[in-house]
């Protein structure tokens, strides 16, 4: 006896199982072989007993609930149930139909042993066959009738063989039980044949399967409709997004084209802005038939007023490279004095050439940036000067000269500069009118030129400054002095020449210097010790004092030559 058999017997005694329950436990054991046909036949005969029937069915349902490693309990329980449905009481098939859901759950039975073999496939196939048999009433009836006939044939064969042996008929239980191994083998072959026939027959779908199929189809249809609606919504949103993107792209392209068109259109003429704060010009309407504006041409608006007070220039022509038309004389604040007009007298230039009587068509005014001429006179002396006296200067009438009788005593001034390059410091023209004592216009002009600062702005009616010459310093009595003899070395007097100096004493010789000079200053007084101490520069003994007297208020003469030995004294007024 095996260990499993001993264990089952111990459990049967402990749990106090009945005879029917013990047979069911034996038929559905965990042994590796199947239940015997004789044991199943005995259990089928016990199903006709009401008490035994309940015990048998409760034990079968308990075995069907096992799982995992007890997969043989489940498989053998379904095999016994199938045999009882075909050969047992009709109450077995009825109770199985009522509890069909327990058999349907076994369609998903899963178990894989240690060797990796799927043992649950046997349980799943057996559950499908049993469910198909319970749902098909006609097949169940045919299978039941065929099993009962086979059972009767087996019983009759067993009865005939037993009658030959014994006189009395065997009991009913003995007829069902196989009497020999050959009969048991025959029953097993019959059961296998019936199982094959059932497996070959196609499973028929019951009403529940149809309902489930319809339900599954409806669910699938609803899912499909839902997915279709979602897909259509996505397509619609995608189409709307594409259209919106196309509209935005079209708008951007249109704006880009408009910007490009604006670039090539004619821009409005800009308003001229004066950097010196001049008034802005009023723009005028451009006529339709006007020509296109030249980008290199003159501005369309009139030029603003000159902030320096100059005359307004005439509008330039449209071509900026065409030479400008001759216009009126422009006032140059840094240039010389412009030439007078034809109807006006020549204006006296205090630092220019003394050519008052020159015609209007004389040489132009000196350019401050042009190279200096060969002859340079810091006091404005001209190389050629007219010797006329009493003429009108600058268009003003002269007063009658009361010393005109002394004109015969004057000598003609040299017509050209000295050949030795001496500066004609006292050369000049005697003006007809002496300047006022408080006239400082010449001093201002001289200071402006000496410092180098720009002259003030031109006044509406400037007073023409008069030139400061030795004649203007001496006044009307300038004709009484021979200026040439004062600044030049006296030459030899020709014999027989008549003396023209009215200040010489009578009876004095015509040649030779005078004995006494009325213009010689008195000798300097001797300074005391306190005066010498307070004096910043002590006087040099034997040297005459230096007197600086500016002529006409002009600046002192700068040194024109490097210092050297002092020139010999040629002043006739000094001893």
From Swiss-Prot:
It is a peripheral membrane protein. Residues 274-379 are annotated as: 8 X 3 AA repeats of D-P-W. GO terms for biological process: clathrin coat assembly; embryonic organ development; endocytosis; female pregnancy; in utero embryonic development; membrane fission; negative regulation of sprouting angiogenesis; Notch signaling pathway. GO terms for cellular component: clathrin vesicle coat; clathrin-coated pit; cytosol; endosome; nucleus; plasma membrane; postsynapse; postsynaptic membrane. Ubiquitinated. Residues 149-186, 264-283, 293-575 are annotated as: Disordered. One of its GO terms (molecular function) is molecular sequestering activity. Ubiquitously expressed. Detected in liver, spleen and testis, and weakly in lung and thymus (at protein level). Transmembrane segments: none annotated. Keywords: Cell membrane, Coated pit, Cytoplasm, Endocytosis, Lipid-binding, Membrane, Methylation, Nucleus, Phosphoprotein, Repeat, Ubl conjugation. Residues 453-467, 556-569 have a biased composition (Pro residues). Residues 501-573 are annotated as: 3 X 3 AA repeats of N-P-F. The modification Phosphoserine is found at residues 382, 418-419, 434, 446, 453, 472. The keyword Repeat applies. It comes from the Eukaryota. Its main location: cytoplasm. SMART domains: ENTH (SM00273), UIM (SM00726). The NPF repeat domain is involved in EPS15 binding. Binds to membranes enriched in phosphatidylinositol 4,5-bisphosphate (PtdIns(4,5)P2). Modifies membrane curvature and facilitates the formation of clathrin-coated invaginations. Regulates receptor-mediated endocytosis. This is Epsin-1. It comes from Rattus norvegicus. The lineage of its organism: Eukaryota, Metazoa, Chordata, Craniata, Vertebrata. The gene is Epn1.
